[in-house]
Amino acid sequence: MAAARAPRALTSASPGSGKAKLTHPGKAILAGGLAGGIEICITFPTEYVKTQLQLDERSHPPRYRGIGDCVRQTVRSHGLLGLYRGLSSLLYGSIPKAAVRFGTFEFLSNHMRDAQGRLDSTRGLLCGLGAGVPEAVVVVCPMETIKVKFIHDQTSASPKYRGFFHGVREIVREQGLKGTYQGLTATVLKQGSNQGIRFFVMTSLRNWYRGDNPNKPMNPLITGVFGAIAGAASVFGNTPLDVIKTRMQGLEAHKYRNTLDCGLQILRNEGLKAFYKGTVPRLGRVCLDVAIVFIIYDEVVKLLNKVWKAD
C-alpha cells in the first residue's frame, strides 16, 4: 500500500513521518492472543471471587459475607490453588477472545481513519462495538457459559465435572450445543458495550496525549494508566449486564425465560443493588486486565513491526 494511503494505526507509529504505519490485522491477532493469555493468568483470582459473589444469590442464605470472606473460605477449603479453579476454561477462551477483538478492531479502524491517519473518538467507539460483537458470538458466550457452569459445579457439595473437557462433554451431552450459548443476547450487549467504551476512552486519551503529533511515542506506563481508566469506565457502564449474563449462564439458568426475564426477576426479588453485586472485585480485575492487555499488545506489535514487514 502506498505511504500516502496508509491509515494511522492505534498502536504503532512511524517516527519522522506525518502519518503512522498500518497495523496489519495478522499482527493484531498474534499480539492480542499473547496479551490475552498472559493477562488472564495474572488476574484470574479476582475473576473467580467476582463470579462466586454473583452466584451467591440473596434468595438463599448467603454463603459469603464479602470479598475477604470468599477468599478465606476458598483458601481454607482448597488452598491457594483454589482461587485458580476454573482457570483452564477461561484461559482457553482468553487467547482467541483477545485475538478476535484486536484483529477486528484494527481491520475496522484501518478503514475508518481520516486522510491524516487519525481515528477520532466516535469512530473508535464504533470500531470497539464492531470488535465486541464477533468476540462475543465466536468466543465469549460459549467459553463464559462453560466457565460459569464449571466454577458453579466445583463449589457445589458434590461436583460432577472431573475437569474442563469432561465438563464440556457433559454440558453438550445433557443440553446440546445450546447449553454453551446461554445468555447470548446479554453477552453480545455486554461485550459490545465493553469494547465500545474501552476503545472510545483509549482513543480519546491517546489523541489527547499525542496532540498535534500523531507519532508521539507512548510509554508503557502511560498506556497502562489509560487502560486502567478505560477499564474502570467499562465496569461502571455495564456491570448490570455482566450480572445478568452470569445468572443466565449458571447452573440455575433454567429459572429464567430469557435475558429480559432474568433482569426483571433480579430487580423484583433482590432489588436494584443486586445489579452491582461483585462490582468491587470486578473493578480491580478489569482495571488490571485492560492495562496489562494494552501494554502487552502495544509492545508485541512494536516487536512484530521489526520482524514482520507488511504493508
UniProtKB/Swiss-Prot annotation:
Q: Where are the Solcar repeats?
A: 23-111, 122-208, 218-303
Taxonomy-wise, where does this protein's organism fall, top ranks first? Eukaryota, Metazoa, Chordata, Craniata, Vertebrata
Family assignment from sequence similarity: Belongs to the mitochondrial carrier (TC 2.A.29) family.
The segments labelled Disordered in the record are 1-22
Task: Please give the function described in this protein's UniProt entry.
Answer: Mitochondrial electroneutral antiporter that exports citrate from the mitochondria into the cytosol in exchange for malate. Also able to mediate the exchange of citrate for isocitrate, phosphoenolpyruvate, cis-aconitate and to a lesser extent trans-aconitate, maleate and succinate. In the cytoplasm, citrate plays important roles in fatty acid and sterol synthesis, regulation of glycolysis, protein acetylation, and other physiopathological processes.
Phosphoserine modifications at? 156
The protein's name in its UniProt record = Tricarboxylate transport protein, mitochondrial
Q: How is it modified after translation?
A: Possesses a short cleavable presequence, which, however, is found to be dispensable both for targeting to mitochondria and insertion into the inner membrane. However, the presequence is required to keep SLC25A1 in a soluble state and thus in an import-competent state. Mature SLC25A1 lacking the presequence is prone to aggregation.
- Tell me one GO molecular function of this protein: antiporter activity
* Membrane topology, as annotated: Multi-pass membrane protein
Q: Which reaction is the catalytic activity of this chain?
A: (S)-malate(in) + citrate(out) = (S)-malate(out) + citrate(in); D-threo-isocitrate(in) + citrate(out) = D-threo-isocitrate(out) + citrate(in); citrate(out) + succinate(in) = citrate(in) + succinate(out); phosphoenolpyruvate(in) + citrate(out) = phosphoenolpyruvate(out) + citrate(in)
Question: Mind telling me which residue stretches traverse the membrane in this protein?
Answer: 29-46, 86-105, 129-143, 183-202, 224-241, 278-297
Localization per Swiss-Prot or TrEMBL: Mitochondrion inner membrane; Mitochondrion membrane
Q: Where is the composition biased (Low complexity)?
A: 1-15
Gene Ontology terms describing biological process: mitochondrial citrate transmembrane transport
Pfam families named among the record's database cross-references? Mito_carr
Determine the domain of life of the protein's source.
Answer: Eukaryota
Q: Which UniProt keywords apply?
A: Antiport, Membrane, Mitochondrion, Mitochondrion inner membrane, Phosphoprotein, Repeat, Transmembrane, Transmembrane helix, Transport
Propeptide cleavage-removed residue intervals: 1-13
Q: Which organism is it from?
A: Bos taurus
The protein's predominant localisation is mitochondrion
A single GO cellular-component term from the record reads: mitochondrial inner membrane
